[in-house]
């Protein structure tokens, strides 16, 4: 997918780029698959900020995505490729013979007119097909992977993401995650074949603050620009560096410090991600 750049007729346009939208074929979305989401802007039920640098952003409707792929053994046709304001991947509208319509994540290479199918048994290995991990050959790249059977896909759902099946052991399948982490997933879990499309999203340059505001991202103030009461890096006459290692506003080391708590599922992780 091509990335479009602009002539630098303003300073912000100089570095701004957008994705070419020629792959989007739909003029409008299916009304029955749209719903409203309450915008919290990073506030909890008391109205207090619990997640900083968030706001409502542009008005948008949520597209209901079929992450479970549980319409088994019925072949559907891809009727349209659509833009989804809530995710960086494109979505595909699948129409089934009984008139049912569902959105799925568009894998790279899936286009209008293609057929997709989901099954609990084995299928041909084609882009967009969904089946249980135990029926997918070793070496295949997959996306939209379940962590618990029937719960719906939770892993490798972002643009350009995929995991690779590396092997099997007892009731588990070994997957190499996008982070290079190796872990066990139950072989009864469903996954879709292929890589999530819109791979060039990572190369887009935001270019100007206004685009981030539309996305619901507020400006981020440096700790060194604050007062000592607001941040450990604050205070000092003029511009001063930090004493010691960089930390968060609450004193947690900011770079490389592990904050993940121990979980029962740690035993399913074979090796953690490799740092580049």
Curated annotation (Swiss-Prot):
GO terms for biological process: cytoplasmic translation. The keyword rRNA-binding applies. Residues 257-276 have a biased composition (Basic residues). Keywords: Ribonucleoprotein, Ribosomal protein, RNA-binding, rRNA-binding. One of its GO terms (cellular component) is large ribosomal subunit. It comes from the Bacteria. GO terms for molecular function: rRNA binding; structural constituent of ribosome; transferase activity. Residues 212-276 are annotated as: Disordered. One of the primary rRNA binding proteins. Required for association of the 30S and 50S subunits to form the 70S ribosome, for tRNA binding and peptide bond formation. It has been suggested to have peptidyltransferase activity; this is somewhat controversial. Makes several contacts with the 16S rRNA in the 70S ribosome. This is Large ribosomal subunit protein uL2. It comes from Helicobacter pylori (strain G27).
